[in-house]
Amino acid sequence: YQHVKAFPRYISATHSICEDLEKRRILLENLQDEENKDGDHPKLWKNFAMALGADEKEIENVTLDWFTKDMIDNFFSQARKSYAEGLASLYTYERQIPEIAETKIQGLKKFYGVSSKEGLEFFEAHKSADVIHRAECEKLLDSLSKEEQEKAEQASMYTARYLWNFLSGMTSKHKLETIAA
């Protein structure tokens, strides 16, 4: 939840250092999707967690594990370094989300009996919206200079590492079985 709650601020940080109006508008559209007044994404995540039996106050007050804090700190760091690095960090995450969202929807239905709108809406929203965000980020990344693309690639690698550490940390914390594909 804490990562989902912070995500609009990653976008906002990158948006604020982007000098090109047209590029900022694209980031702004993404930010508006995240903070939609009828269903901001942190609220949708809370609804998902509550559909699984979580308490709303506990969701807000959970103590961050080191791997979650490190991931969030990396996103903020990349988002504030440069437009290219912030954009690449956002892309690294959003690139994979539509397919992950679909897999999560199937798993939540099959293994956890989650079928309510509230329980699935976060993933339904990301299944479609992030296809658009991914394509927009790709166009923006393609428009970077060679030097900016090198910075973006490095930022993407850092972000991927922090995402991996986060997932590994969750797997270890909850003693989940891992199966290599």
Across the structure, where does each feature detected by a protein language model lie?
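Non-heme di-metal
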Residues: Y1-A181
